[in-house]
Design a protein with these regions (language model features):
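Residues at the beta-strand->loop junction immediately N-terminal to the Walker
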Residues: 31
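Conserved lysine of the Walker
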Residues: 38
């Protein structure tokens, strides 16, 4: 926690003390440029939830999409999504990092729709919502995905310089 700013520390502590958001299938979105600590904050939140006996699973966005896409090719998409329902919280790291094919974004959208109001997500993205049309192939899908994600969400926009860059300048 010491590595984060006072506001980020307050967020982590608040989320720890008020984890009711998990029981109501709320989401946490961490949005900001590369290197500002989004994944570290997501990991801290996930660790705190695990300490509270909440089932959490971590995916890079690419790994999740590839897993779901393979399940769809095998005609097992619903089974794969249902298997993930045993986790109260799923972390999707770097949702905006990789441009996905139409087929991959379709399964990502289906997954978001499946989790809506039934399970919590912690999502990190280096793309603000105004650029999520680069993630999803059409405007209607983009709007629908964002709408479902933010409905019961805490949205944290993180600004600042890259911690990795700061560290490299010190060395």
């Amino acid at each position: 926690l010491e590595e984060f700013s006072a506001s980020e520390q307050q967020l982590i502590i608040a989320q720890k003390d008020h984890s009711d958001w998990v029981h109501y299938a709320g989401n946490v979105l961490l949005i900001g440029p590369s290197g500002v600590g989004k994944s570290h904050i997501a990991a801290a939140l996930a660790s705190q939830l695990i300490e509270q006996n909440v089932r959490v699973k971590w995916f890079s966005a690419l790994a999740l999409v590839q897993t779901l896409q393979q399940a769809k090719r095998d005609l097992d998409l619903m089974i794969a999504m249902t298997r993930l329902d045993k986790y109260q919280v799923l972390v999707i790291d770097d949702i905006g990092y990789v441009k996905k094919s139409d087929a991959e974004t379709q399964v990502l959208f289906e997954f978001i729709a499946h989790r809506y109001e039934s399970g919590s997500l912690i999502i990190t993205s280096n793309q603000p919502f105004s650029h999520w049309d680069q993630i999803f192939p059409d405007t209607m899908m983009t709007v629908a995905a964002i709408d479902r994600i933010i409905h019961h969400a805490t949205i944290i926009e993180i600004e600042g310089d890259s911690y990795r860059r700061k560290q490299s300048l010190k060395n």
